Amino acid sequence: MSDKIGLFTGSFDPMTKGHVDLIERASRLFDKLYVGIFYNREKSGFFTIEARERIVKEALQHLRNVEVITSQNELAVTVARRLGTQAFVRGLRNSQDLDYEANMNFFNQELAGEMETIFLLSKPVYQHISSSRIRELIAFQQDIAAYVPQSVIKELERINDEKN
């Protein structure tokens, strides 16, 4: 029997505790779960891809069946096929996420009909946390520790140390 392989993608700019929770839950559904840090052309980047990779790897190091990858110039379906993935895993916080993901799923099915998409609902405690809100809090120098893994705080400290 072949391994069940999933792919959870995002820009993770920055990663939130909601992301970590979804990935932990998804990791229990697969033999191998890839977490793909993808460059999103519709979003302006706060952290570099390299910084995001450090953040995500540290936040997920306790998950033995999870491997973090990055991609800047490929469609998720191309990466998924190369990795032998059977399913995309996506998190849903609200109806706006569902609308966005339904549109993405349409194109994923058009391009890679053999792949399934599994939607996991965010836990209520994480439904109002978004990377864009976290970036706004960072811009106004607010405490974000309740919303992000410690690796985000460490990366911000590293960036501040480099500036000083």
Curated annotation (Swiss-Prot):
Reactions listed under catalytic activity: (R)-4'-phosphopantetheine + ATP + H(+) = 3'-dephospho-CoA + diphosphate
Protein name according to UniProt: Phosphopantetheine adenylyltransferase
Residues at which substrate binds: 11, 43, 76, 90
Taxonomic placement: Bacteria, Bacillati, Bacillota, Bacilli, Lactobacillales
Protein keywords: ATP-binding, Coenzyme A biosynthesis, Cytoplasm, Magnesium, Nucleotide-binding, Nucleotidyltransferase, Transferase
Source species: Streptococcus sanguinis (strain SK36)
Localization annotation: Cytoplasm
Site positions (Transition state stabilizer): 19
Keyword set includes RNA-binding: no
Gene Ontology terms describing biological process: coenzyme A biosynthetic process
Pfam families per UniProt: CTP_transf_like
Disulfide bonds: none
Functional pathway: Cofactor biosynthesis; coenzyme A biosynthesis; CoA from (R)-pantothenate: step 4/5
Sequence positions that bind ATP: 11-12, 19, 91-93, 101, 126-132
CDD domains, per the entry: PPAT (cd02163)
GO molecular function terms listed in the Swiss-Prot or TrEMBL record: ATP binding; pantetheine-phosphate adenylyltransferase activity
Cofactor(s) the record lists: Mg(2+)
EC number: 2.7.7.3
Gene expressing this chain: coaD
GO cellular component, one term: cytoplasm
